[in-house]
């Protein structure tokens, strides 16, 4: 099986693995790697099937987490954005002894709306899957525009994300479809109750994909975790507010000693 693309930079004594979201790749972290590299040893990863980690089709969440773990350092802080948040959470559930802390960014344990749970309407996710088969580049671009809508720098932020996608090979339609299937079906709400490691959750108030209404619901469900809401950010707070985004990560590093 192909190795996944993995780059290690920085000289901090704390290892930080960064997992990107659906349709993207590790280039999305370019706006924060300079700030973080002097504090952490950063592990930048293209998830299987994305960016430079070609040769993978659709995978289950468990298989994706296992594949990433195989190349990971023995111990690290794991940070996952959006779909990457589910992968990082799955890693923490499978091997908590290898995770010093879990950080999820604009991520939900259950992306699909159901009953009284706020999220993306299942028919919207199914629509994206349908559109992928028709014109997947345009579908990915629409998804990127949705991620930055509402922020003062929306156009510029969408450009940064689009640049990250277009600078590398496009993911295969199978990998993209597999990622949407994970977003549509996975529900880790109960599985993450009582997670035995520090857990930090970061959100954007203007996020159109992960509604801020889930924040108090998860505060109640996971009382040991900590949540931070960036007031003027949407789905990609590290792109729109890089300096503010890095602050809680540096505080977490201090807390871990």
UniProtKB/Swiss-Prot annotation:
What this protein catalyses is:
6-carboxyhexanoyl-[ACP] methyl ester + H2O = 6-carboxyhexanoyl-[ACP] + methanol + H(+)
Q: What positions constitute the catalytic site? A: 82, 207, 235
One Pfam family it belongs to: Abhydrolase_1
**Gene3D superfamilies found in the cross-reference section:** alpha/beta hydrolase
* Pathway membership: Cofactor biosynthesis; biotin biosynthesis
Q: What does the entry list as the binding residues for substrate?
A: 22, 82-83, 143-147, 235
Coarse class of the protein's main subcellular location: cytoplasm
What subcellular locations does the record give? Cytoplasm
Q: Name one GO biological process term.
A: biotin biosynthetic process
This protein's GO cellular component annotations are:
cytoplasm
The UniProt entry's coiled-coil ranges are none
Query: Which EC number applies?
Result: 3.1.1.85
Mind listing the UniProt keywords for this protein, alphabetically? Biotin biosynthesis, Cytoplasm, Hydrolase, Serine esterase
GO MF terms here are: pimelyl-[acyl-carrier protein] methyl ester esterase activity
Q: InterPro entries given for it?
A: AB_hydrolase_1 (IPR000073), AB_hydrolase_fold (IPR029058), BioH (IPR010076), Carboxylesterase_BioH (IPR050228)
SUPFAM superfamilies found in the cross-reference section: alpha/beta-Hydrolases
Domain AB hydrolase-1, by residue range, is 15-241
Q: What is the role of the protein in this entry?
A: The physiological role of BioH is to remove the methyl group introduced by BioC when the pimeloyl moiety is complete. It allows to synthesize pimeloyl-ACP via the fatty acid synthetic pathway through the hydrolysis of the ester bonds of pimeloyl-ACP esters.
Which family is this sequence assigned to?
Belongs to the AB hydrolase superfamily. Carboxylesterase BioH family.
PANTHER family listed in its UniProt record:
HYDROLASE ALPHA/BETA FOLD FAMILY (PTHR43194), PIMELOYL-[ACYL-CARRIER PROTEIN] METHYL ESTER ESTERASE (PTHR43194:SF5)
Subunit-level organization: Monomer.
Protein's UniProt name? Pimeloyl-[acyl-carrier protein] methyl ester esterase
What is the species listed in this Swiss-Prot or TrEMBL entry? Klebsiella pneumoniae (strain 342)
């Amino acid at each position: 099986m192909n190795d996944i693309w993995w780059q290690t930079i920085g000289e901090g004594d704390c290892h930080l693995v960064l997992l990107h979201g659906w349709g993207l790749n590790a280039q999305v972290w370019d706006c924060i790697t300079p700030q973080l590299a002097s504090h952490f040893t950063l592990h930048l990863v293209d998830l299987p099937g994305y960016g430079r980690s070609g040769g993978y089709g659709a995978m289950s969440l468990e298989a994706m987490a296992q594949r990433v773990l195989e190349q990971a350092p023995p111990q690290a802080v794991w940070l996952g954005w959006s779909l990457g948040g589910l992968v990082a959470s799955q890693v923490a559930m499978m091997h908590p002894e290898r995770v010093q802390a879990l950080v999820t960014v604009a991520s939900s344990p259950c992306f699909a709306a159901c009953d009284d749970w706020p999220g993306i309407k299942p028919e919207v996710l199914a629509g994206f899957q349908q559109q992928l088969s028709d014109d997947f580049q345009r579908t990915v671009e629409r998804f990127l525009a949705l991620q930055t809508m509402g922020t003062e720098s929306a156009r510029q932020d969408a450009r940064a994300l689009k640049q990250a996608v277009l600078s590398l090979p496009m993911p295969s339609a199978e990998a993209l479809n597999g990622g949407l299937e994970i977003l549509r079906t996975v529900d880790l709400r109960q599985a993450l109750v009582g997670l035995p490691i520090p857990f930090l959750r970061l959100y954007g108030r203007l996020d159109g994909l992960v509604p801020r209404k889930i924040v108090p619901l998860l505060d109640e469900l996971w009382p040991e975790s900590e949540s931070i809401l960036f007031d003027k950010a949407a789905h990609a707070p590290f792109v729109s507010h890089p300096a503010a985004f890095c602050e809680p990560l540096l505080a977490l590093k201090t807390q871990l000693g």
